[in-house]
Amino acid sequence: IKAGANLINDTWAGHDPELLEVAGAHGMGYVCSHTGGALPRTNPVRVRYDDVVDDVISETGKLAQRAVDAGVPEDRILIDPTHDFGKNTYHGLELLRRCNELVATGWPVLMALSNKDFVGETLDRPVEQRVPGTLAATAHAAAAGVAVFRSHQVSETLDVCRMTLAISGDFAPLHPVRGLV
């Protein structure tokens, strides 16, 4: 906080309740993540959900309400399905396939897709070869209305988001001259 941070990205889904209190007391933003009940720094196996998207919506919604109750400003709350945390590759793909349902909750959605295991397992690629898969996933999520992306490839991710928004008519080309002058 002293260094200027204004957002807490709680990747462990409220496991440490003091983070909510700190965010509320200081008017900070808060990212409500979903880990499927996984404890911090664990890597669960054979994770099962009746419906992973419904579970993410339910749990992040509850955490968002806890954040509001702790004093976090509603306009500073985001939800994050938290790909790879308490989820397998099939869950990650389902969350992307149905990310419009997350957007429909009304909470801004954050996704951290960069170089994730679900990308590597889907394409059978090591971490250093996951950029194309990451950018494809990002384009899909951006087209569905995901608001924020955490990325290792910032410039490329920005270009993908801008191009996706330009295709949908929600972003004006930065330098349109061909055939216009």
Per-region residue spans from a language model:
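Short strand-loop junctions, especially beta-strand C-caps/beta-turns
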Residues: 82-84
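Phosphate/pyrophosphate-binding loops at sites that engage ATP/ADP/AMP, CoA/4′-phosphopantetheine
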Residues: 63-76
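Active-site-adjacent loop and "lid" segments of alpha/beta metabolic enzymes
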Residues: 2, 6-66, 86-181
